[in-house]
Amino acid sequence: MKNKKRILSGLLAAALVVPLFAGGAQTAAAAEAAGKTLDVVFTHDTHSHLNSFSTVIDGESTEVGGFARIKTVIDEQKAENPDTLVVDGGDFSMGTLVQTVYEDEAAELRMLGAIGCEVTTFGNHEFDYRSSGLAQMLKSAAESGDVLPELVVCNVDWDAMEAAGLNDGQQQIQSGFEEYGVKDYVVLQKGDVNVAVTGVFGVDALACAPTCELLFRDPVEAVRETVAEIKANEDVDMIVCVSHSGTWEDESKSEDEILAKSVPDLDLIISGHTHTELAEPIVHGDTYIVSTGEYGRKIGELSMTQKSDGRWEI
């Protein structure tokens, strides 16, 4: 059965920022009594919207979004809790004129690093400039010397591609992955909480990426194996998945809901791709699914507390 909790939402507007997901403030004593805590800030589907832009809200033109405002929220949160986890769910590129310098400047990925994003994954639009464009973007980012987010994706099927013989495009992306340091997962220490973050590229995302030359494993199977690897080899308190798969109204076709039900050891899924804006998380068992819309109009923020059984709750 799908359980839901009510949480808050708000726009990244000029004078006021209200987090999309807010678990509620806790006193230090209450947090200690409840167990370990982790604050998370997240974005997805920002689509090259590095600058603020105007939209109509309640009949009035309002300036929203922009990485400067997002950074302000992140900085304010980190001033309160330096161990806040900041992640992104992919499709950080393609959507404004900024995309014209995607290959040579890697502006979107470098800006994610500049605002404090620690981990992101690939969306379908990262493949819009074909294999050569993605590979060059990764190399440009790596060569910039800037602080960059980790890039994670666990279901690229390199074994199948290598068995068949890598074509030119696949070789280019493999080289870009190696130069950037793309991984199946990473482990981050956030205060007293060790967090594993993996990433996955969804079935519909692949269908929306006709220029993508990579082969991918089934997302559920790949995440299940990666989670098993994490549990066998890493000492972690929480497992997070930045997923570019999405949710749909039809639960039987809702990829990240299928993932949550199929891999119950996941604690949190940051769900990108469908540009969904969830005013409250979707919950299956002990797995929370959260989404915050598109273009950086809103930013997700939540606080999780570890329960006595080791699982987490908002």
Predicted region positions:
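Bacterial N-terminal signal peptides that target proteins for export
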Residues: 1-11
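Acidic, metal/ion-coordinating pockets
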Residues: 30-314
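Low-complexity, intrinsically disordered short peptide segments enriched in small/polar/basic residues
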Residues: 4, 14-15, 71
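Hydrophobic core
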Residues: 12, 16-20
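Sec-dependent signal peptide cleavage junction
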Residues: 20-34
